[in-house]
């Protein structure tokens, strides 16, 4: 396979509203990011991905864009952005931005003109339909709950919004829409950014005719993913997108590819004809949709991640992640954010970080930041969470039971302010932040962990150093071992010069690792999260709860 700078990179994701406030208004901003670039550089990351900075009314925290070529005033100005981009490049790092083109804000000039009249020149820039029998055009449910259609009194038609009603879907069947989007993308790339993470891109193609979903349960609105997620014909749109934008620049692109199966991976992220440099697949995150007190199926976890490794071996590239701004904190879901917080955060990091692909670290993940449990739904900001709460309680679910779901799976778990130190407001701001801070910030923070060589932060630094030092962790092959073990996730990475073993117990009870073909010795142990006893030529070792070991042989 060809070499590419993004294959060797480690990406650090920033959610700007919660990263660092520079002007005391309780909201993170661009100048705040500039003050923390040295922190990211010292960690060892080489690429920064920043969630939307564009002008937005913030119905969905920036994913409802009002102006693609302007900066939200809360975050700063375009001049601030240009300074940030220059700083990042001066540090020999790169910057990728979120690209949100399935939908815009309903306050975008395109939509304002579109809704002004049935005869507007931009009417078909969005998806407008007449109602059916006094109801919505079809029975599709929005991803955020409720109908996927909103009635507009001025023109007596409905517009489609797969997400919030303030996020109308663009009509990608319209060539003028596509060309306007391409012009905007190229404007940013000409400015000098280094790529995009492409949001919700699997939803741009809708099933022809917009038919009703089958509805055997007689629901008011039916989850409609089969008719708008990775739908037939989407590759034609994506191929044109790539040809008119991405392929013209030496950039990194990451597609948010919800609904894409491992067997389709080459079409999306294949080196020969794939659309993107890599994609985020979400199959393993489906394992989080379990009962609140149910443990994760480790065998299924291994199988899913291995399927993706195998599907792209020799033909494409994986994006490796456990957290982002839309997911809960991994240590609170996959690990143990109580007694074994430090150990489990490190074990999880070792497992995902050293697979074949480009690893992503979400802000605070390198500290083992945890989920938060605010008592009231009013303490939360996320529009999807609030819709969930309204829907569940309206159907009779108790406040307590709904909050258990919020505490485990809510998106705001990862959106609380970055915990920089033990000072007021966790060093994030000098004023009360836009959302509450996790109360554990007084002991779980960046300053404390930088001063503790046994911290999660320093373990991440060590993982990054390993990856930078040994090519086997970048280009080596991947081989799962012990696939049916219900506690241990173990795999090999191999190239012509090295073999590496990554083995981690992902449970709170001891687990016996046994493999006769891998004699384990202390002199080959390059990293572990728990101090080990001297050992030589062992064919089995007892791994303590959440113990992880990385061995390397020449």
From Swiss-Prot:
Protein name per UniProt = Probable oligo-1,6-glucosidase 3
Q: Identify the species of origin.
A: Bacillus subtilis (strain 168)
Which PANTHER family does this UniProt record tie to the protein? ALPHA-AMYLASE FAMILY MEMBER, OLIGO-1,6-GLUCOSIDASE 3-RELATED
* Superkingdom as given in the UniProt entry: Bacteria
Q: Which family does it belong to?
A: Belongs to the glycosyl hydrolase 13 family.
Enzyme class (EC, first level): hydrolase
Q: Which region is the signal sequence? A: none
Q: Which GO terms describe its cellular component?
A: cytoplasm
Transition state stabilizer, annotated site positions: 326
